[in-house]
Amino acid sequence: MFVGQYVEERSMKMRIAIGCLLASFAITAAAVAANPQAKLEPKPTFASVLDHQLSSTEKTVVPAAEAMPEDKYNFAPTQGEFKGVRTFAAEVKHMAVANFHLGAAILGEKVPVDTGNGPDGPAALTSKADILKFLNDSFVYAHKALNSINETNILEPVKSPFGPNMTTRLALAMSITGHPYDHYGQMVEYLRMNGIVPPASRK
């Protein structure tokens, strides 16, 4: 579904992703060795490291979605090179759609909600409240998916949700934590064009 909307992770990107996870474990292990009290802390797992990263992403993008007034949710620039770009609402719904599809692929199950017939989510979702619920629910589901990842299944082949190829849970997890930032940048532009400072940029 949505073939062409996403690109499969390449081997170099995979090596970088694995390297980042291993580096995180190494840093934590070094901290524990240097501080005996740290041994009382829970040992990090693949799931906990990935889930922490998703929480960081969520804490950045959700407040941005909340910051736009309802009467501006359908805002999109219409002139010059901006013509045809997604509205603010479509950006938010698109993030949620991706979260649901990536999460379902990690869990090996069908997407649990109606995500519409395209990458921008259900057309029936038009109010700010409904769109925010869709986004928040998608993050709840994404957290569930990441917490199912362990050292046994993290590199097992799984079907990509965006084409016929196979991928891994690690590749999907890196997408689910990083993909929202692709659209957060656009949301920031829309907020600032309407005189709103993004929450993450406020002092």
PLM regions with names:
Residues 1-13:
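Short, Lys/Arg-enriched N-terminal segments with co-localized hydrophobic residues
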Residues 37-46, 109-124:
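Acidic/histidine-rich, surface-exposed loop or edge segments in extracytoplasmic proteins
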Residues 51, 55-62, 74-119, 159-203:
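Short, contiguous alpha-helical
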Residues 19-29:
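Bacterial N-terminal signal peptides
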Residues 60, 64-65, 103, 141, ...:
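Well-ordered alpha-helical scaffold segments within catalytic/enzyme domains
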Residues 66-75, 146-155, 192-198:
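Surface-exposed helix-capping loop/turn segments at secondary-structure junctions
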Residues 29-36:
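Boundary at the C-terminal end of the N-terminal hydrophobic targeting segment
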